[in-house]
Amino acid sequence: MLHIRNLSYHPTASIQPILSGIDLDLPAQQLGVIVGPSGSGKSTLMDILAGLAEHSSGSIFWREQELNLLYLQQLCGIVFQFPERHFCGGTILEELRLGHPDLTSDRVRKALGEVGLGDLSLQTSPHALSGGQQRRLALAVQLIRQPQILLLDEPTAGLDWSMRRQLVSLLAQLKTQWTLLVVSHDATELLEIADCAWQISNGKLKEIPVAQLKAQLMITNSIGAKG
């Protein structure tokens, strides 16, 4: 289980803390969703859990072991909102072999198959893929690393309805093997497969029952549609 206890993040350049008093418990092989508007601190929390930023105070545990930056980098794999900005390989094969030069073609194919990209040519450029395919490829990159926790920052943002449904279906399959933590400003589809949920606002996190959050978002979306 992932435990976060009283975590805060207050960089010296900021007058106010970006995150304050964060508590979170996420059991293994479950999917948790954090919902909040832009600027609420949700992406910063993802960066901290991925070991890309160091929290100012508080503790992070996995299976009762407290984690530092190095352990977090090994434990967690992150898929960014715009993964295409982070692709470095000229082809899908090169992308998946970054850091794994001895990776066999069979293992590459297996990883691509796990994310529904098994029919693609390994010589295809990552930048030639659609937005949904790029997010799937970014997931395949992380699956090859074999992290314990998959972190996803706005995985459905900017995708059409069909692509969103496909991605949500994929995440439902992945949570049978991995622990997933997802942040989103609009988690309507994601809540269909979520086991637990939180709302974040002004750097403060509050746990909320999934059914209650779904009802709130339905009302909000209905009002927005009428407007």
Where are these regions (language model features)?
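Conserved H-loop
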Residues: W178-V183
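Catalytic Walker B motif of ABC-type/P-loop ATPase nucleotide-binding domains
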Residues: L150-E154
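Helix-to-loop junction immediately C-terminal to a conserved catalytic motif
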Residues: A50
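Conserved ABC ATPase "signature" region
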Residues: S105-S121
